[in-house]
A protein has these predicted regions:
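Membrane-helix boundary/helix-loop-helix interface segments in multi-pass membrane proteins
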Residues: 1-21, 27-30, 35-160, 333-347, ...
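Hydrophobic alpha-helical transmembrane segments
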Residues: 54-62, 282-299
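Transmembrane alpha-helix boundary/anchor motif
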Residues: 61, 69, 126, 199, ...
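Hydrophobic alpha-helical segments of polytopic membrane proteins
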Residues: 79-80, 86, 142-157, 163-211
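Hydrophobic, glycine- and aromatic-enriched re-entrant/interface helices and adjoining loop segments
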Residues: 99, 105, 191-287, 312-313
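Alpha-helical transmembrane segments of multi-pass membrane proteins, especially transporters
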Residues: 117, 142-147, 190, 316-324
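Interfacial segments of multi-pass membrane proteins
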Residues: 131, 172-186, 261-287, 345-360
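Loop-to-helix entry and N-terminal half of a specific, functionally important transmembrane alpha helix
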Residues: 304-344, 350
Length: 398
């Protein structure tokens, strides 16, 4: 164990969660990509397994590198990395690849990049930096407006093609502002405005002639909402959720066993959007509870890191990333069991998808880097005193 901790620094429980999610993902992706392999790779069922394994290995390497990077790098580079993400998001709107009727990825060096995955990570780091720097000005309306402006700049290009991701980003950002002690009346005003806009959007969506908007995602959004509310026709969204619920219901307590899923043959994208349903079908309620517990544990370990931190920036970073990752996971699970409308959100570190794996690995690497830094900081405090910690706080806010 001591040798492990010397190599893999930071919170050992977070490392355990990483390895658990990665292992479950490899098994689930291999089981759920059979049809895809026969339709795209002439029956080579190992193709997607090996590709997914390759991304996992690269992701773990990236995670290891990131968790060893000096912590001040995150603070100083956050604004530049966020602006790069924003530029790529707007580029995607014009030259992005069309996947499932949405332009979400762009080609870079022979690979496809989903900038929204990148933006989710770097926005959290930027918000943590800005909130920690402005702790004495959190009651200032200008501080709130600047934060909100940057958040809207990120989600504006995401909304047309990936509304569910935009909602995850907005929810996480709002929670971070609450934790960062932004004035309550500003938060309530934001929530009130959000509810009003959502009501207006729903009214327009239900009453507009969708034939005029076939080139947009609006017909898809309308169908998914109608399916969820039980007022729509028998659509693809309805079919997806029915098949997903069948998978969950037939899994029982112990599951059908690895590789024995039947609903993978009927579910669209069982290796990404509905991978939780396949996991529950094959590994039962026990497997589902294991995954749920892993993400709950992630939040609890993040809270532990926060309580141990004597500085606001690292505390906000680790909690923001943990909440964002877990919230996305719980939304994915809610869709799979029919409690939420179809969103297209993947299960972090489990679903197939190279960009998602890499940027989730970066996110976990940052969390591990924070916990490693706090461990070292506690040791420094015991030998050099609190003054050095106060000096580091000033360095974070530069």
């Amino acid at each position: 164990m001591n040798k492990f901790r010397k190599i893999f620094k930071g919170d050992p429980f977070i490392w355990g969660i990483v390895f658990l999610l990665s292992a479950i993902g490899v098994l689930a992706v291999y089981s759920s990509t059979g049809n895809l392999a026969y339709s795209k790779q002439e029956g080579n069922t190992e193709f997607y397994l090996l590709r997914h394994l390759g991304f996992i290995v690269v992701g773990l390497f990236v995670m290891y590198v990131v968790h060893n990077i000096p912590f001040k790098f995150y603070s100083r580079s956050s604004i530049y990395l966020l602006w790069l993400s924003i530029v790529l998001l707007f580029v995607t709107l014009f030259v992005g690849y069309n996947i499932n009727n949405a332009q979400r990825v762009i080609p870079i060096f022979g690979f496809t990049l989903q900038p929204s995955d990148m933006a989710k990570v770097f926005l959290v780091i930027f918000l943590a930096k800005y909130l920690s720097k402005k702790q004495q000005e959190v009651d200032n309306l200008q501080v709130f407006i600047r934060l909100l402006g940057m958040i809207l700049l990120v989600i504006a290009p995401i909304i047309p093609e990936n509304l569910s991701t935009a909602l995850v980003v907005m929810t996480t950002s709002t929670l971070l502002m609450v934790i960062g002690r932004i004035k309550t009346k500003f938060i309530l005003g934001l929530l009130g405005t959000g509810v009003l806009l959502a009501a207006m959007f729903y009214f327009l969506l239900m009453n507009l002639d969708m034939n005029k908007y076939q080139h947009t995602r609006m017909p898809t959004w309308k169908k998914r909402i109608e399916t969820y509310m039980g007022t729509g026709e028998n659509t693809d969204s309805n079919y997806q959720q029915v098949q997903s619920q069948i998978a969950v219901a037939t899994g029982g307590f112990w599951g059908k066993g690895p590789g024995n899923s039947t609903q993978r043959n009927y579910l669209p994208h069982p290796y990404s959007d509905f991978i939780f349903a396949i996991i529950v079908e094959e590994y039962g309620l026990l497997g589902g509870l294991l995954l749920i517990s892993a993400f709950i544990l992630l939040i609890l370990r993040a809270l532990k890191v926060v309580l141990e931190s004597q500085r606001s920036f690292p505390a906000l970073v680790v909690l923001g990333i943990a909440v964002s990752t877990s919230f996305q996971a719980f939304v994915h699970m809610g869709v799979s069991v029919g409690k939420l409308p179809v969103t297209g959100l993947t299960l972090p570190l489990v679903s197939m998808g190279g960009t998602s794996i890499i940027f989730n690995s970066i996110a976990f690497g940052v969390m591990l880097g924070v916990s490693r830094h706090i461990q070292e900081e506690k040791l420094k405090a015991s030998t050099t005193g609190v003054g050095s910690i106060q000096k580091d706080e000033e360095e974070d806010n530069k």
